[in-house]
Every structure is written in structure tokens, then in C-alpha cells.
Amino acid sequence: MRTTILCLALCTGLVCAGPASAADAPAASACKSTVSGDLRLHTLKSTIFGNERTIRVLLPPGYDDTVNKERRYPVLYMLDGQNVFDACLSDVSHHEWSVDETAQQLITGKKIPPLIVVGVDHAGRDRAREYLPYKDFVGNPDMDEPAGKLFPDFMTREVMPLVDSQYRTLPGQPNTGIGGSSYGGVATLYALLAKPGTFGYGLIESPVMWIGMGQLVRDTSPLVAMPVKVFVAFGGKETPDPVISEKMIGLVRQVETNFHAAGYDDSNFRFVVDPDAVHTEAAWEKRLPGALTFLFGDWKPTPTPQP
């Protein structure tokens, strides 16, 4: 029974606390896009995964102004790109992260620097296979063999070169972040560990840390990869069972302990428990201003060393 509950709560194509009713789902033709700002779309054909997806690039205010024509920007890559900017594309919770509105408000208010946000769409029914480096024996035991160990290479060899070739990005670990939720949070943490010289900032929401029977937790001890800053958050009601939710929080606390053992403190690793929050984009949207401010509030441009 517990496995069934967990699978319903965590292992749908797009995660949420529970399935929305049909009445909540706007018809595609009737749904009005909620995108705010200058969002540009690209189609990426992946050799690594053998499929294609949309890459959604949100440019900061003033990007095309003449005064900024030589300016380069840090980049935050967000997984599950369908859910990042537009509620019409979020076909389970029908809610978005509102990264576009939130980022623009924080930039205009000078809480964070102007940055480019890239939404990387998931692969639909292959989402779990692409995001997970280890099998989810608890919540999704019948899943295909995971291919998530290829995901960091997919980002660095296919997604990032596309973005860098089209936009004025600031390359390098001090200028590059990655974020995601649930299985996307797992992929985010794995990318931070697998590509320590690439991703300097991690935004990890509601990660499913029992994958591989806890192997990803063990991967953080000893901690070899050293990102600049990491923000992790979890809701107190991620599942209907409070015992399971507390055990999930305990796994993330072990990751926090491992980061602290490597020298991190509250200035560069933050773990937030949101007591009444469930497993949905609405919760991640609510915590987003604090996450972005923590990660990028004191960011300064760091030039890439020349060979």
C-alpha cells in the first residue's frame, strides 16, 4: 500500500501531490499562456538520448538594449522545462514555477543580477529513465533501466553548447547553475557531483533520495565535488503518510550533514523544511524567491581563465 501511495505521489510523468480533477484541467485550445518576458524556443535533437525536446530560454530585462550588447550573463538551467514558465504546459498540476515572473521581479528589485534562465524540457514517458542515475526500487520498481548517468553529459555536450552558441552567456562553474524538483532534483544533485567544474549553483526541490536504496546519499560522502552554493527544500507533507515524509526528510538531512562535513555552512548550503507544503509546483513557486536570492544574491561576475 505504501509503495502504491508513493508511486501515485512521486512517479507520475510530472510530479504533484495527487492527480488533479478533470475539471481543473483547462483545454489546450482554451488555455492562455502565462509566460512573462522574452522567452525563446529551440528544438534540440539529442544524440545521447536519441530523441528531441524543446529548450526554453528566458532572457533578462534589457538583454537586447544597445547599452548591453557586450554584456554576458550567468545562466540557470531548470529541468522539467514544461513546468517552469507556463501553466498551460503543466499537464498534471496545471501550475508553474513562475520562474519568469519571479526572476524578473528579483532582477528589477536588484535582489539578484540579470541572468538567463533555460528551461530544459523532460522527455515525457522517458523522464524517469533520463533523470535517475540509479533505479527507484521503492516508488517505481518497474521502471526501465535508468540512463541518468548520461544526463550530465547531455547537459554539457548538447544543451549548454546550444545555449552558449545562441546567447551571451558567462561560461564556467562560478556563473552556471542547475535546478530541478523530485526526480529532477535527483538529476540536479547528480549533475553537481558528476560535473564539479561545470555547475556552481544547485537548486534542489523535493528530491527523491531513496533511489538506488540510498546510493545518491552515499555519493555525497566523502564529498569531492564542491559547488559554490546549494539550496535544498522539502515539504513536510510530500506524501499522505507523515512517517514516510519524515523518513524522506531524514535522507536529505544526511546529505546536509555530509556537505557540512566537507566544510559547508549556512552561508553556502541551505536546507529548508516547509512544514505544510506538498509535492507540487505551487510549493516550489512559493520557495523560489528565497532560493534564487540565496544562490545568486551576492553573485559577482567571474571571468573564465584563459588557457
Feature roles, as predicted:
Residues 18-22:
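Sec/Tat signal peptide C-region and signal peptidase I cleavage site
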Residues 1-4:
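Positively charged n-region of N-terminal signal peptides that target proteins for export
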Residues 23-307:
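Non-catalytic cap/lid and distal C-terminal segments of serine-dependent acyl enzymes
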Residues 6-7, 283:
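Alpha-helical and His/Cys-centered functional microenvironments
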